[in-house]
């Protein structure tokens, strides 16, 4: 779909002799640039691969039609690149495949029609998630900047998008790593002969504790709780010591030590940049697949496993008539692939200029979706086993959602398997590695953005800046480490970050497609890859993907989730608080627009035109090439 960008630039042929065209983002005609002086064939921006000539000048040589010319490099500051292509792929896969793939997708799938849910999920992936994923990779790879400074080359007035992304990343780091700390606490507790959540004889247990798998005959009542439930609620979270958000209680020193250890690992994994994090992900991104394979085989051999699989995949086609199913499918694929968080921009900016990001987008998206699907078998074979042992329906066993599905239901199932200690250790180690590489990615998005925006301050002080970021995240996590920390985690996840990142992604998609222009963007992709995106991608970027995001946002606003955790109903003021926290990030966008218009000289029309016109052309790093079909 051809659209006329609102900040369209003059094409080279429209510039008259000796006219200054550099302001419009193209080469001056007849006036040599510094890069021209550096040697023949070198270029200084990203808008031409053929030397331009002034009116009346004779072309130095003719280029045969339908051939591809390779253009030599320009000289600019060296930018770090990935050591290997697999470093990049594993980092992107590790970022996209996170804890949500393990607990959220299986739960949403069975709740929304089982196998029938795969249809809306696939449709939303093809028309919404994957196009946005591809767009961010291409933007980052072409412009080679983080999520703040990249907007100078796209549409400067929307630079506030980058600041909003950084604030959202801080909020996510404030609660996401607490979940990893819970998993670490479980891992440490697993190094015993008998897992502590198998018995009702511990100091934290109550009189209601009832062991399903006890040898003696037991009576289960409405007030009965399992050992795994009491271990999670009363020992790990200590949630019984909190009355709610109005009284969070004290900080758990055990969880505080766990999160300190988590952030220490994070610091030494990312402090040197992608050269170090690219090596760490060879472990953190591959280990979960080894564990998932082991757990899948083990689960398939358990009695009653087939009951869980049938419950997971049995299609209920009537569900597809409900709007909520399509909303859940759209939200799941968006948050699973993760466009709009600035991470894909940052990771792709360290690629070589002519790296095939189109292929990367397809491969990593398919791997992510397949991981979610396979994780459902890992979870539901075990839930089927639990239902068989309890002599209950699978729906009764699978009523837990979110982290509780992993830390209560799945943990209890593991505890009652043969070799339970071994399976507990590898399972919680898998959860930790899944969380770590997602955190690596989230913080790298912020670090790259700030270092690119303020290179004169932080370029040679990366280690110190990373330390500041890590300490800030630890301080931001303190509320989630209290007895009522789980309430804070849920509030931040549902209201403070979800709607905000959807809004940011929507604005980003509209700006790239309609202000920067889909024609210009596709031209950029062609320069990198040698081929232009087809009509399917153009239509998705211009219309379908923005509508996809708008659909999720409107559905959320019309039917906001009713927050309830365990037996606690969130007060109304907490919902307002959540919206305020979310708005605190998105508000950066209009604030920067106002600042830009006020600080730019000229009439209002001149200010607007200058503010939506790219400030600087994009250059390619030394050693890379552009591919232009002439």
From Swiss-Prot:
Q: What is its main location?
A: membrane
Which protein is depicted? Sodium-dependent serotonin transporter
PTM-bearing positions, type Phosphothreonine: 276
In this entry, the parts of the chain located on the Cytoplasmic side of the membrane are: 1-87, 136-160, 272-277, 348-360, 444-463, 517-538, 596-630
Q: What induces it?
A: Expressed in a circadian manner in the midbrain with a higher level expression seen during the dark phase (at protein level).
Which InterPro entries does the record associate with it? Na/ntran_symport (IPR000175), Na/ntran_symport_serotonin_N (IPR013086), SNS_sf (IPR037272)
Species this protein is from: Mus musculus (Mouse)
- Output the PTM entry: Phosphorylation at Thr-276 increases 5-HT uptake and is required for cGMP-mediated SERT regulation.
Subunit text: Monomer or homooligomer. Interacts (via C-terminus) with SCAMP2; the interaction is direct and retains transporter molecules intracellularly. Interacts with filamentous actin and STX1A. Interacts (via the N-terminus) with STX1A (via the H3 domain); this interaction regulates SLC4A6 channel conductance. Interacts with SEC23A, SEC24C and PATJ. Interacts with NOS1; the interaction may diminish the cell surface localization of SERT in the brain and, correspondingly, reduce serotonin reuptake. Interacts with TGFB1I1. Interacts with ITGAV:ITGB3.
Q: What is the lineage of its organism?
A: Eukaryota, Metazoa, Chordata, Craniata, Vertebrata
* Compartments in which it is found: Cell membrane; Endomembrane system; Endosome membrane; Synapse
Bilayer-crossing residues are 88-112, 116-135, 161-186, 253-271, 278-297, 325-347, 361-380, 422-443, 464-483, 495-516, 539-558, 575-595
Q: What else is known?
A: This protein is the target of psychomotor stimulants such as amphetamines or cocaine.
Task performed by this protein: Serotonin transporter that cotransports serotonin with one Na(+) ion in exchange for one K(+) ion and possibly one proton in an overall electroneutral transport cycle. Transports serotonin across the plasma membrane from the extracellular compartment to the cytosol thus limiting serotonin intercellular signaling. Essential for serotonin homeostasis in the central nervous system.
Keyword set, alphabetical order: Antiport, Cell junction, Cell membrane, Cell projection, Disulfide bond, Endosome, Glycoprotein, Membrane, Metal-binding, Neurotransmitter transport, Phosphoprotein, Sodium, Synapse, Transmembrane, Transmembrane helix, Transport
Q: Which Pfam families match?
A: 5HT_transport_N, SNF
Ranges of compositional bias, category Polar residues: 1-11, 42-55
Membrane-related topology note: Multi-pass membrane protein
Give the matching NCBIfam families.
Answer: Na_transp (NF037979)
Question: Catalytic activity, per the record?
Answer: serotonin(out) + K(+)(in) + Na(+)(out) + H(+)(in) = serotonin(in) + K(+)(out) + Na(+)(in) + H(+)(out)
Annotated residues that bind Na(+) 2 are located at 96, 98, 101, 336, 368
Hey, what tissues is this thing expressed in?
A: Expressed in the lung, midbrain and brainstem regions. Expressed in brainstem raphe neurons.
Task: Give the positions annotated as glycosylation sites.
Answer: 208, 217
Mutant phenotype after disruption: Mutant mice are born at the expected Mendelian rate. Knockdown results in loss of serotonin uptake in synaptosomes of brainstem and cortex, abnormal barrel cortex development, enteric nervous system hyperplasia and reduced peristaltic reflexes.
Q: Write out the residues that bind Na(+) 1.
A: 94, 97, 434, 437-438
Protein family (similarity comment) = Belongs to the sodium:neurotransmitter symporter (SNF) (TC 2.A.22) family. SLC6A4 subfamily.
